[in-house]
């Protein structure tokens, strides 16, 4: 796989040293929240100019600025309405309660921090709660803890994209932000939002064959939200048994490698038999749709987008390593199976399908041969406009509108947390 010039691992230091002023610009864009159309319009204008301008440092600067501004604006999106009013559910208030207890020094020891997290939100992943505890000690209100955690998750995703391709990173970033997943992750699924960012970084390291670092970051992701462990398990299975590049397990002469391939084929055969009946599949789909649950609808939306991403990759003959394609296929199969037989698990796993096809989109702009720069800019512009329309539709239909009048704090629910 061909990538642009690699970015150093200390990406945050590079951003601050070379583009420190852009962070300030992104912060300033979020100030006039009483007039939310202005900062959002300015951010989109910067991204459009970055697409249309010729190559050069100015284009890179605008791309970086628009990406950071998008992250910060979406950080403040949820606080612009009441948490429950915006369709985010009661879990958001449970997280706020945990942040409030952290700030009031109700818990001090590591064990107390975990107990507070489990009691408030029902999840005992230590990495997330220790991170939340550290952030809570730096700010006065649960609102700021919430916003900083969202910003951290967005910047982790952005860093992974920035390291993969520097020229069109903003296009892929906008495409990622335009889907329903990030809106959901910023609501009741704040733990998984941070985990998604860590998984993206782990996948980037895995692509670069930095296996030790990828494993370390992957463990951090699993410690942030347990559903990330399923993705790591699928990746490990593909790397150990199906990849041509990793150790003795991949050699045809290795009996363990052959056993691994046989095991994978057996699993696929069982899955094919289980899903071989059209009546069975249709009955499961109808049962899921008739449950009248808010999660089932967007779960199938993610499944459709995952299939479209696969078609997109094969249609344009994406130059991805074989193990990456197999990993994505096995993971989508796992998600489809769990969505039928274990809906509570499947709804969480499907969010990680974005990690794969964001990588597909990153590679897309550098893998296509025989195209002029103008053609690539045209494709980028079309993708950008499509993602903008999709974002407006999703937010307006499912989250009662993005553009609201008044300040950020004024729209929050009254209560002890604010």
Swiss-Prot record:
The chain crosses the membrane at residues 21-41, 45-65, 142-162, 170-190, 222-242, 262-282, 296-316, 326-346, 347-367, 377-397. InterPro entries: EpsG-like. Keywords: Cell inner membrane, Cell membrane, Membrane, Polysaccharide transport, Sugar transport, Transmembrane, Transmembrane helix, Transport, Virulence. GO terms for cellular component: plasma membrane. GO terms for biological process: polysaccharide transport. Disulfide bonds: none annotated. Signal peptide: none annotated. This is EPS I polysaccharide export inner membrane protein EpsF. It comes from Ralstonia solanacearum (Pseudomonas solanacearum).
